Amino acid sequence: MFLQIPATLIGGYTQSIVAVVFGMLTLLIVLFITNVSTGKLSNETIILAGIILSSFLSAIISLLVALTPREDVSNILYWTMACVAMRGWGQVHLIFPFFIVGTAMILFHYRELNNMALGEQSAQFTGMDVKRKKKIILIGASILTGGAVAVSGAIGFVGLVIPHLVRLLVGANHRYVLPFSLLIGGGYLILADVIARTVIAPSELPIGVVTA
């Protein structure tokens, strides 16, 4: 009985845990490439390494699709285009722990984000360990991303554009940018889901198509 309880709990979170673990693994590879190439965590190098790794992983997904039985291909393609159909409170419970941990890690470092927005050199003058804080923030973002992708698939545009729109509305202070991005991003996703469910009803578009 003692061993069965943890197994039961872990079993429900398997997909989310695997997604977070591989998200962290991807982050480690990006950081490794960045350190090997420049020796420092510059934003430009991190972005470039992320693009390179994203292309490589996309090729692996394409290979898996090619090797998948024909009857299962549609399910994989639908997931890669992102979908929240048939998702309910059960999935919310699965990602909630990852949401709390990742959000707390990022919100707690809003001051550091404000300092880094002025430039890494300026942030270092304040006595901040830029490299360490950047790693913590990236880990928090990986936890959030892994938990979300495990449930809905990769939904583009929202995480890329919404924070910039919020910054235009509330200013550059991350104390406000982060929570408002959370709220407005969620509202935008709900609106996109409504459009995806109604525009070609009774069929449904993948939500990733609408957001993009």
Task: Give the label of every model feature segment.
Residues 1-212:
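Alpha-helical transmembrane segments in inner-membrane proteins
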